[in-house]
Amino acid sequence: MSKKRIYEYAKELNLKSKEIIDELKSMNVEVSNHMQALEEEQIKALDKKFKASQAKDTNKQNTQNNHQKSNNKQNSNDKEKQQSKNNSKPTKKKEQNNKGKQQNKNNKTNKNQKNNKNKKNNKNNKPQNEVEETKEMPSKITYQEGITVGELAEKLNVESAGIIKKLFLLGIMANINQSLDEETLELIADDYGVEIEKEVVVDEEDLSIYFDDETDDSDAIERPAVVTIMGHVDHGKTTLLDSIRNTKVTEGEAGGITQHIGAYQIENSGKKITFLDTPGHAAFTTMRARGAQVTDITILVVAADDGVMPQTIEAINHAKEAEVPTIVAVNKIDKPTANPDRVMQELTEYGLIPEDWGGDTIFVPLSALSGDGIDDLLEMIGLVAEVQELKANPNKQAVGTVIEAELDKSRGPAASLLVQNGTLNVGDAIVVGNTYGRIRAMVNDLGKRIKSAGPSTPVEITGINDVPLAGDRFVVFGDEKQARRIGEARHEASVIQQRQESKNVSLDNLFEQMKQGEMKDLNVIIKGDVQGSVEALAASLMKIDVEGVNVRIIHTAVGAINESDVTLANASNGIIIGFNVRPDAGAKRAAEAENVDMRLHRVIYNVIEEIESAMKGLLDPEFEEQVIGQAEVRQTFKVSKVGTIAGSYVTEGKITRNAGVRVIRDGIVLFEGELDTLKRFKDDAKEVAQGYECGITIEKYNDLKEGDIIEAFEMVEIQR
């Protein structure tokens, strides 16, 4: 007997999956969800329980049907006897018939009308009696969220008016179409003495339900590890992969820097390893932001002659957020200025402590150019993969993740996929993110056409009807019609979702998400002007104690807010706190596009108060800062009794006389205050628009220099 899943077995018996799950639990069988496969012995035990009870119900129904047929036959015989009795009566005389012809005609009409009325009444009465006989109050019912009064009455086999009356006695005015909440539903059911249970609704459009991890699957075999290489620019990521794979990837790319995500598979000591070569860590984060978790091991490449750099720190934070083991590859040890010990010392500050120093992080010194240490690195990858016990079932229909996608001029939409479970075949009907299709051709990482690909294998496919996004999941279906239906439904849902507000956390909606149980950790990224301020702010935020949510600092750094910070905040559903710093142009655009909340402050107390108030639900709708323009200082003039006049050129928006201003130098805020004078030539001006020059003096501030940015802003009252 072939294995069946719980929902398939339930469908055969016209039962709810929940009933099967409850019965299995009563048999002391551990059940994770409705997708779990049933063993042969379990199916036999369930057959005895459910099919036997169904057989009894069928016999009972047949007995009732036979009894009903017998009654119908008796009624028919009675009618025939009555009819023959009426026919045997003698007819009246012709004279009497002629004499009362009109009267008989009228009587006949009245009689027909009376008979028709009686027949109509009989038709109505007969089904009513039958329903009253079969209607019984069930001992238990199941319901879906949002059940109405009418639907509940139908399930309980009672009149809607009875339920409406009970609701009225509870102080609830309702009609037949009123939806009931769980608390009210429990009160009504308890009043009727009926047990209720919420139905588990399975959404086939949710591709995540097909990514089940069945550890008891006897067909599961060991699969290759998926490794991501990350690190600072020019520290040798692609050169390292090139040395491992014995190809010259770097030479064929512009400037020697990786331009796209490459996925490659190599074999070492009889075991395969799949490498994802990401451009820095942006793609890695983008995939994780869409819910994809494809990486098993992260290799952090650090140059021995350069040490820990800003992108190295960001890569460490990304790896920690993804919760995958990290192996540190200390590259360029063959250079005269190499100092591996310094690298290890610097990385201990970020929680990566070498095994030799009592930690649990593997450090491998190597040279990507000469090939020294490559074998040691591959050996360490094999050991870490062995400890993780990575397994997959090649006999299932394939599921996995999109690594990259493009629109090819000759082939149409093409996508690089990583198979995570099952086997992908040419001709399979597939749903990829919000698109679908049938696989027309499949190419491996060597550029060769293949017909099938097993777990942890990267392939490029064609045949889908649109370009998916990196990080989208894919699922193979046995029926092309089903794949089309699900793909179209997902596309429509994505269009609707794009029109709605983003659900990224912000201080404005933080308390609402806490109430709904959606928030347990508030992820925070802190950027400041000096390291001391950043550390002080991080320590202060960690001390905030509000029940139901914790503050988690996921990244801190000195300098202006950049696009990478916004990407990390979006992937981690976090917010960005800027202390005495401003976002650059790219960060502003990215934050607006991804709806990431950025809060800019100059006083630590204000930051703490704002976040604590948001966590307690006390954040009042007051004012929002709106930047109205920027001017660049081109020349300065010092005038006695006046101060420093900044000869400026308005580069963005406009500068108004009543606006607040801040002076920014190299992305760091130096001063915030009010405008003193705004002049156009010798005349006072109310405002100066973009593209015009003006003279600016600032109250109580004269330390203006050429190249400074004067940013004008207004405080606008908003409704939250």
Swiss-Prot record:
Chain segments carrying region G2: 256-260
Keyword Nucleotide-binding set for record: yes
Compartments where located: Cytoplasm
UniProt-annotated stretches for the region G1: 231-238
Region Disordered, annotated ranges: 48-138
Region of interest called G3, as start-end residue ranges on this chain: 277-280
InterPro entries: EF-G-like_DII, IF2_II, IF2_N, P-loop_NTPase, Small_GTP-bd, T_Tr_GTP-bd_dom, TF_IF2_bacterial-like, TIF_IF2
Biased segments, Low complexity type: 60-75, 99-113
Gene that produces this protein: infB
Region (G5): 367-369
Domain tr-type G: 222-391
Function recorded in the entry: One of the essential components for the initiation of protein synthesis. Protects formylmethionyl-tRNA from spontaneous hydrolysis and promotes its binding to the 30S ribosomal subunits. Also involved in the hydrolysis of GTP during the formation of the 70S ribosomal complex.
Family to which this protein belongs: Belongs to the TRAFAC class translation factor GTPase superfamily. Classic translation factor GTPase family. IF-2 subfamily.
Keyword Protein biosynthesis: yes
Main location (coarse class): cytoplasm
Stretches for region G4: 331-334
Annotated Pfam families: EF-G_D2, GTP_EFTU, IF-2, IF2_N
One GO MF term: GTPase activity
Gene Ontology CC annotation, any one: cytosol
Keywords per UniProt: Cytoplasm, GTP-binding, Initiation factor, Nucleotide-binding, Protein biosynthesis
Chain intervals with Basic residues compositional bias: 114-123
Binding site for GTP: 231-238, 277-281, 331-334
Protein name: Translation initiation factor IF-2
